[in-house]
Amino acid sequence: MTQSSYNPIEQEGSPELLLQEKIRRPKMYQVLLHNDNYTTMEFVVSILMKIFRKTMEQATSIMLSVHRKGIGVAGVYTRELAETKVNTTHMLAREAGFPLRCTLQEVDE
C-alpha cells in the first residue's frame, strides 16, 4: 500500500485560516432612540434602565443626549437582541401612550 500525499489541511489552507473562516463575529447593530415632543424624560430613563440595563447615571446621560441632539445610542447588540429591544421599547411606549421611536443601525466594521 502506498502512502497518500493528500493532506486536507494543506489543500484547504492553514488551521488558523480554517478557524477564521468558520468563526466570524456577528454583525452588530446600534439601537437608536429618537427624540419627540411627547415622551417624558422620566419614561426614557426608565426604558433605558429596564430594557437596556443602564444605571441611573448612564440612562440620564443617554436621555439628555437624545433630548439635545435628537438621537442617541441606547446600546450595541447582535441583530436578534437589538430587534427584541426595539420591539419591547415600542410595546412599552405604546402601552404608556408615548410615541417613542427606536431604530437599528448596522455598526460599520
Curated annotation (Swiss-Prot):
One of its GO terms (biological process) is protein catabolic process. Coiled coil: none annotated. It comes from the Bacteria. Pfam families: ClpS (PF02617). SUPFAM superfamilies: ClpS-like. Involved in the modulation of the specificity of the ClpAP-mediated ATP-dependent protein degradation. Binds to the N-terminal domain of the chaperone ClpA. Belongs to the ClpS family. This is ATP-dependent Clp protease adapter protein ClpS. It comes from Lawsonia intracellularis (strain PHE/MN1-00).
